[in-house]
């Protein structure tokens, strides 16, 4: 069975931070790890944010982006984001009670839902929404 990894798991996989050990365990246990083209854009945004905020150096960012590109090419299945995913994400945002679901997370959820695969996330709001919307989820506290 495949699992869809959101960006909250991928960032600590490639940057040394609090969730790094858990991210390594999650990716190691999953023989079929999926992401979307949305995830690729979000990863790029997160790395740029870390660099602009002075959280990491240019060298660290370059290394992380290179390792991520290698992982995408050799290990991850990258799926397209469809118009129906955006429509479904809008519905998920509207139907998820407080604290709600942010649009980027709703899009990840819609993609996992479309494929009927497990969501792997470290985002607790997204993990809660998975349960509400019938998507199996693995998360870390």
Predicted segments, located by residue:
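Short, well-structured N-terminal submotif of metal-dependent ribonuclease cores
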Residues: 1-41, 50-66, 132, 138
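Acidic, PIN/NYN-like endoribonuclease modules and their adjacent C-terminal/linker elements
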Residues: 2, 85, 109, 113-141
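Conserved glycosyltransferase catalytic-site signature
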Residues: 7, 83, 104-106, 123
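Short active-site oxyanion
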Residues: 30-33, 77, 113-119
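Short beta-strand scaffold positions
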Residues: 35, 80, 103, 120-121
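Short glycine/serine- and small hydrophobic-enriched flexible loop segments
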Residues: 45-52, 114
């Amino acid at each position: 069975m495949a699992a869809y990894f959101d960006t909250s798991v991928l960032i600590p996989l490639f940057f040394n931070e609090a969730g790094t050990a858990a991210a390594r365990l999650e990716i190691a246990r999953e023989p079929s790890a999926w992401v979307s083209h949305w995830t690729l854009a979000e990863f790029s945004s997160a790395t740029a944010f870390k660099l602009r905020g002075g959280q990491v150096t240019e060298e660290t960012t370059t290394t992380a982006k290179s390792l991520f590109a290698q992982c995408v090419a050799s290990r991850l299945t990258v799926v397209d984001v469809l118009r129906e995913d955006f429509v479904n994400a809008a519905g998920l945002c509207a139907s998820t009670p407080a604290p709600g679901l942010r649009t980027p997370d709703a899009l990840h959820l819609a993609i996992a839902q479309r494929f009927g695969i497990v969501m792997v996330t470290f985002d607790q709001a997204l993990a809660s929404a998975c349960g509400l919307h019938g998507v199996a989820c693995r998360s870390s506290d």
